[in-house]
Amino acid sequence: MTIRKILTEPDPFLRQKSKPVEQVDDEIKTLMDDMLETMYAAPGIGLAAVQIGVPKRVIVIDLSKDNEKKNPLFFVNPEILKKSEEDASYEEGCLSVPNQFAEVSRPDTCKVKYLDYDGKEKILDAKGLLATCIQHEMDHLEGILFIDYLSKLKKSIIIKKLSKQKKNLERIVV
């Protein structure tokens, strides 16, 4: 397993739509293993393939706490079949929008159809934080970031901060 570089906003690569996976083969399994390793190292609770420069419809999620046994979920070609009308708000962050957090409201539950790590079709009824995380990661597959749900002002402030952080990092590296 390899830890890969996570792309950060305002990288235009993050804004593209991801392509469906034709079949879950060894290449896709290696991708999922690398994504999981990258997510744990960051650390984070969810990651979409596009965030590491692979525009495929693959996401990984693990909501287990540090002291708990790992419980990774793998979603290939996820598709939301149903969302609740009731919303829930969580303070969201994102590995591609480092050190920035904001309250985002999303449907509290969702039903998702997907292929698992072994390519088997599954359906999951998710609620609460898991539902929010699935929807957040699936947004990445459409080129959408959580900051797109914020006011123009809040979004522009965050993007300016990220650009400044990036420039400062480049100065340090060079």
Describe every region a protein language model picked out.
Residues 1-135, 140-174:
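Active-site rim/adjacent substrate-binding subdomains
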